[in-house]
């Protein structure tokens, strides 16, 4: 299957649960920069971030093979919200591990989607190690933040943007682990 076909299939999966996010021109930025400026408002999605697209696609791919009873991931926020949201939609228990001092609003959102939140470690790496050990000990399905099925789901935002505004000459994306840039 071509990459475009993969994105179109992922879009069908994603749109079964959420609506496309808007892309809006920003005239004030345009006047300051001297060029057309479009912003893709992923903040309008249920979790407030593009990563929910990846979670929905990932869980759809799991459903096509064998849906686990429980999943786990380590995060500092948006990946955990994505997994919690998609797991709840799939009827799967989610365990999300975050470090001490994590953003309390992100923690509340993760719990709000029904996930079990564990606060372990002083930084993300320690949380990751704890989550990995717990996954092995309790036979939990590990949801990595960089899995191909997540990245393809995330890529549906670019499909929307390029379909709506096909003559873009530059695209700027935020980069954390890079799933938004890869998608």
Feature locations, PLM:
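PLP-dependent amino-acid enzyme catalytic core
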Residues: 1-183
């Amino acid at each position: 299957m071509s990459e475009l076909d993969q994105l179109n299939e992922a879009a069908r999966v994603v749109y079964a649960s959420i609506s496309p996010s808007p892309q809006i021109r920003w005239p004030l930025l345009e006047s300051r920069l001297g060029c057309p400026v479009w912003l893709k408002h992923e903040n309008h999605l249920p979790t407030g971030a593009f990563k929910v697209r990846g979670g929905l696609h990932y869980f759809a791919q799991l459903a096509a093979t064998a849906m686990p009873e429980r999943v786990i991931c380590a995060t500092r926020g948006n990946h955990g919200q994505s997994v919690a949201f998609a797991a709840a939609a799939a009827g799967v228990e989610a365990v999300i591990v975050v470090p001490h001092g994590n953003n309390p609003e992100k923690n509340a959102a993760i719990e709000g989607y029904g996930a079990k939140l564990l606060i372990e470690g002083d930084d993300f790496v320690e949380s990751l190690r704890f989550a990995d050990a717990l996954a092995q000990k309790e036979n939990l399905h590990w949801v990595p933040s960089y899995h191909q099925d997540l990245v393809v789901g995330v890529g549906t935002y670019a499909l929307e943007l390029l379909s709506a505004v096909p003559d873009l000459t530059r695209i700027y994306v935020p980069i954390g682990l890079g799933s938004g840039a890869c998608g």
